[in-house]
UniProtKB/Swiss-Prot annotation:
E.C. code: 2.8.1.6
Record note on cofactor: Binds 1 [4Fe-4S] cluster. The cluster is coordinated with 3 cysteines and an exchangeable S-adenosyl-L-methionine. Binds 1 [2Fe-2S] cluster. The cluster is coordinated with 3 cysteines and 1 arginine.
The gene coding this protein: bioB
Gene Ontology molecular functions: 2 iron, 2 sulfur cluster binding; 4 iron, 4 sulfur cluster binding; biotin synthase activity; iron ion binding
Name used for this protein in its record: Biotin synthase
Length: 337
């Protein structure tokens, strides 16, 4: 009986495990052509890279978010239930008051979650206004109320003054996703603003030494090659956390009839992202329950070392307690159980 043979492409990619340096764009492109059993070997390598460089102590990054301001968004993002341009049935409300935000943070804090994100709908805050100042007060207040809680935010496009205030408030991470490769943003995501607005915000955040959380949405019509393009754009921007969402089609949006991606393509994308970002946090978010279903745990063995827990902006997620138990079981695959 012949012994198992590892594909030469994967053998070449094992250099990441030895050096901690990213695979090249060319090698990532060739790895994307792998099929069948070779994909499992690719996932195995990605998991080893994660364990060695991103989670050597077996630690996983879990975070919870609060939809603190919902709906009535001026932008025309094709996947989003909160856009005024779409016809989705979504609740709209202004910025939540302090008590509701603190209550939400307290619930997940009590269950062991130590990253909590405040998310608002809308284009963003290029200038500082009263609402933005309220958000700053929420961030500082939460940090005082809950010791060790890392408060994050996703507030859209920023200006220099608003970024500076976030830095002064001690924000842990700022999320602003690029979603797809630059040359596909206007036709796949939105044309009411440019992706460059987001890239400029990332540069502002880096200037103010704020760690950036920036990722993608998979399944909006992009190709695998375009996913690789975005993975390397994120590498050039040196973002700290990369959330990968899988499209959950929402009725009343232009993408409501989209077909789900194949699980093999999703896990391959996660693995390639890990090989291009050996030491970063890569977390999976929307779609893990509804699209991945029985295979969601596989993503944590394909290079991911974090996830969003407790629900998303307009859709429900898994219970935080269930996810905490999930994290404990995953430790058995890290060699740190």
């Amino acid at each position: 009986m012949n012994g198992a043979v590892i594909d030469p492409l994967i053998q070449e990619a094992y250099g990441v495990l030895e050096t901690g340096r990213s695979v090249s764009y060319d090698l990532a492109t060739r790895l994307a052509t792998l099929r069948g059993e070779a994909v499992v070997d690719l996932l195995s390598l990605a998991n080893k890279v994660k364990n060695r460089f991103a989670a050597p102590d077996g630690a996983l990054h879990s975070c919870s978010i609060l939809n603190a301001k919902s709906g009535a968004c001026s932008e025309n993002c094709r996947f989003c239930a909160q856009s005024l341009h779409n016809q989705a049935d979504v609740e709209s409300y202004s910025l939540l008051d302090r008590s509701k935000v603190f209550e939400a943070a307290g619930r997940v804090y009590a269950k062991g979650v130590r990253h909590f994100g405040i998310v608002t709908s809308g284009y963003g805050y290029r200038t500082v206004n009263k609402e933005f100042q309220r958000i700053i007060d929420l961030i500082t207040g939460l940090r005082e109320e809950y010791p060790g809680l890392k408060v994050c935010a996703s507030l859209g496009v920023l200006g220099s003054d608003s970024a500076a205030l976030l830095a002064d408030a001690g924000i842990a991470h700022y999320n602003i996703n690029l979603q797809v490769s630059p040359d596909r943003y206007s036709d796949l995501i939105a044309d009411s603003h440019s992706q460059n607005d987001r890239i400029e915000t990332i540069r502002l955040l880096r200037k103010h030494r704020i760690a950036v959380c920036c990722g993608a949405i998979l399944g909006v019509g992009e190709t695998m090659q375009e996913r690789i393009d975005l993975i390397f754009v994120l590498q050039a921007l040196d973002v700290a956390v990369i959330p990968l969402n899988v499209l959950v089609p929402v009725d009343g949006t232009p993408l409501e009839g989209s077909l789900p991606l194949a699980v093999s393509d999703i896990v391959k994308t996660f693995a390639l992202c890990r090989l291009a970002h050996p030491d970063k946090v890569i977390k999976f978010a929307a779609g893990r329950e509804t699209v991945m279903k029985d295979f969601q745990g596989l993503l944590m063995l394909a290079g991911a070392n974090g996830f969003l827990t407790g629900g998303y902006l307009t859709t429900r997620g898994r219970d935080v307690g269930d996810d905490q138990a999930f994290m404990e079981q995953l430790k058995h695959f890290s060699g740190r159980s």
